[in-house]
């Protein structure tokens, strides 16, 4: 009875930074089941790319971060998420590309592109494009795909990013061929003093993974 009372009394806020990833669904499900057990714990979610999340982790503003690879986790403790993100391109329905089932580097060579502003991600993309990378037409860079989707809708170009299973009536997502996938890690600073709520959530996410 005392143990059950302690569980219910656990309280506090857990601040998590997260990029746009399918792993956010897994994390959201974990938050839901955690709050069923600890209803007095609240969560603060900060949406940003991995570089911005790491900056806030390092300054102590965030307790944890959901980071898409490639990312240096040397100074963090981490839990690798089971979900992987599939890369592709978001195009308007009236684009000639929308008629394809998948896109190749050659298909995108003459198309204005919107790409991630992260240098580490650009290096990954350059490996996929090979010698065509230097000939690409980069129209804009972005850090959140929803803003990029608005630019696609307005005709700025096609956006390279993850398949987040979002429904756009006037846009279509096409996977890359050859396929390209990216992993995600949930990280927190090594040797940091954890609040009881954060420590309990660390254990919970490991158990549900």
Can you annotate each of these PLM segments?
Residues 13-17, 65, 90, 114, ...:
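Short, well-ordered beta-strand segments
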Residues 1-8:
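Alpha-helical "hinge/linker" immediately C-terminal to small N-terminal DNA-binding modules
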Residues 26, 30, 104, 124-125, ...:
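Short amphipathic alpha-helical coupling segments at ligand-binding clamshell hinges
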Residues 8, 76-87, 91-113, 196-199:
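Flexible hinge/capping segments at coil-to-helix
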Residues 54-55, 106, 149-150:
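Alpha-helical segments flanking ligand/cofactor-binding loops in enzyme cores
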Residues 111-133, 194-202:
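Secondary-structure junction motif
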Residues 74-80, 84-86, 146-193:
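Beta-alpha-beta core module
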Residues 11-73, 133, 140-144:
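Central regulatory/effector-binding core of bacterial HTH transcription factors
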């Amino acid at each position: 009875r005392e143990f059950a009372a302690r569980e219910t009394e656990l309280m506090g806020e857990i601040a998590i930074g997260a990029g746009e990833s399918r792993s956010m669904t897994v994390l959201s499900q974990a938050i839901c089941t955690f709050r069923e057990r600890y209803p007095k714990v609240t969560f603060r979610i900060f949406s940003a790319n991995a570089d911005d999340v790491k900056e806030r982790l390092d300054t102590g503003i965030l307790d944890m971060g959901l980071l898409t690879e490639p990312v240096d986790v040397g100074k963090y403790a981490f839990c690798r998420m089971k979900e992987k993100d599939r890369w592709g391109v978001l195009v308007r329905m009236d684009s000639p590309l929308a008629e394809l089932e998948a896109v190749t580097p050659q298909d995108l060579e003459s198309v204005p592109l919107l790409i991630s502003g992260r240098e580490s991600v650009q290096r990954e993309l350059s490996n996929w494009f090979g010698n065509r990378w230097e000939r690409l037409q980069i129209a804009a860079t972005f850090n959140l795909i929803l803003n990029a989707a608005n630019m696609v809708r307005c005709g700025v170009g096609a956006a390279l990013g993850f398949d987040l299973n979002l429904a756009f009536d006037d846009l279509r997502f096409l996977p890359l061929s050859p396929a390209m996938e990216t992993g995600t890690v949930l990280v927190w600073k090594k040797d940091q003093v954890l609040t009881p709520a954060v420590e309990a959530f660390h254990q919970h996410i490991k158990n549900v993974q």
